[in-house]
């Protein structure tokens, strides 16, 4: 077992096609945009420049995260490292909001309801019908999951509940060996992990935004608590600007 500090890197996928269209995405499996691919490559360059070279990758079952990780690792010359994938790192399931325009949803339901669905810790959107065109209930990649485990909607609390077992059972053991661990995932699965790491309250987590494509580096002590709360973005100025853009997503036309 290696001694602390343990090195953890979090990377939200680059801009996706539905990010660009301002649509709720959730479990819908969309591709990166050209901009998103460039963000991923730049993320790998930032890792290489900082000397933060991952030894193992953990990612979701969704192509936007998988592709981001591939591009970043290729850019950092680490494409050869072991890869572990889990549905537990998937984006939050947005229920009946999946495929809907964020600005139109805001206009239809009002800011209070919109923000409750989008940012509250424990209020999920209405469930998505299992025969809906944007449902993943019968997707073959989830065939081994019991039906009661496959979500029809989720709040952030649900994401934390399904993500934390993977943190403790799969990511922590890699950290304990001294590996530098890269987690390439999604806005909400990473928000849930940061909530756990930094001890953010259920109320305050609503204000946390994670930008696309900019690595967030943590050094963790022997109890897996951050030596620097909030970690360190490898491009702080770009992260600050991107976080403001994420905040304003619902306001786009």
UniProtKB/Swiss-Prot annotation:
Q: Does the keyword Isomerase apply?
A: yes
Stored InterPro entries: His_Pase_superF_clade-1, His_PPase_superfam, PG/BPGM_mutase_AS, Phosphogly_mut1
Q: Which Gene3D superfamilies match?
A: Phosphoglycerate mutase-like
Q: Which cysteines are disulphide-bonded? A: none
Residues recorded as binding substrate, renumbered to this chain, are 12-19, 25-26, 64, 91-94, 102, 118-119, 187-188
| Site for Transition state stabilizer, residues | 186
Q: In what pathway does it function?
A: Carbohydrate degradation; glycolysis; pyruvate from D-glyceraldehyde 3-phosphate: step 3/5
Q: Does the keyword Cytoplasm apply?
A: no
Give the E.C. number(s): 5.4.2.11
What does UniProt list as catalytic? 13 (tele-phosphohistidine intermediate), 91 (proton donor/acceptor)
Could you cite one Gene Ontology molecular function of this protein?
A: phosphoglycerate mutase activity
Q: Read off the SUPFAM superfamilies from this record.
A: Phosphoglycerate mutase-like (SSF53254)
Give the top-level enzyme category: isomerase
Keyword vocabulary terms for this entry: Gluconeogenesis, Glycolysis, Isomerase
Output the GO biological process annotations, alphabetical, semicolon-separated.
gluconeogenesis; glycolytic process
Q: Which reaction does it catalyse?
A: (2R)-2-phosphoglycerate = (2R)-3-phosphoglycerate
Q: Cite a single Pfam family from the UniProt record.
A: His_Phos_1
> Can you tell me which family this protein belongs to?
Belongs to the phosphoglycerate mutase family. BPG-dependent PGAM subfamily.
**Function of the protein:** Catalyzes the interconversion of 2-phosphoglycerate and 3-phosphoglycerate.
Put simply, this protein is called 2,3-bisphosphoglycerate-dependent phosphoglycerate mutase
Source organism per entry reads: Streptomyces griseus subsp. griseus (strain JCM 4626 / CBS 651.72 / NBRC 13350 / KCC S-0626 / ISP 5235)
């Amino acid at each position: 077992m290696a001694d602390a500090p343990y090195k953890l890197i979090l990377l939200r996928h680059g801009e996706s096609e539905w990010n660009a269209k301002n649509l709720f995405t959730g479990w819908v499996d969309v591709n990166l945009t050209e901009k998103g691919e460039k963000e991923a490559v730049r993320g790998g360059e930032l890792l290489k420049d900082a000397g933060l070279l991952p030894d193992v990758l953990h990612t979701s079952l969704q192509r936007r995260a998988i592709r981001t990780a591939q591009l970043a690792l290729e850019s950092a010359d680490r494409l050869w490292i072991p890869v572990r994938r889990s549905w537990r790192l998937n984006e939050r399931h947005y229920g009946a909001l999946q495929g809907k325009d964020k600005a139109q949803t805001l206009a239809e339901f009002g800011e209070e309801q919109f923000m409750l669905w989008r940012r509250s810790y424990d209020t999920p959107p209405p469930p998505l019908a299992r025969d809906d065109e944007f449902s993943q209930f019968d997707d073959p990649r989830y065939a081994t999951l019991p039906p009661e485990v496959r979500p029809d909607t989720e709040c952030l609390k649900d994401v934390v509940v399904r993500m934390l077992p993977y943190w403790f059972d799969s990511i922590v053991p890699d950290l304990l060996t001294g590996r530098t661990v890269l987690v390439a995932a999604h806005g909400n699965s990473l928000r849930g992990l940061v909530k756990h790491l930094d001890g953010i309250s259920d109320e305050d987590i609503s204000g946390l935004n994670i930008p696309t494509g900019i690595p967030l580096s943590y050094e963790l002590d022997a109890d897996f608590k951050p030596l620097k709360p909030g970690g360190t973005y490898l491009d702080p100025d770009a992260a600050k600007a991107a976080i403001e853009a994420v905040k304003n997503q619902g306001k786009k036309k």
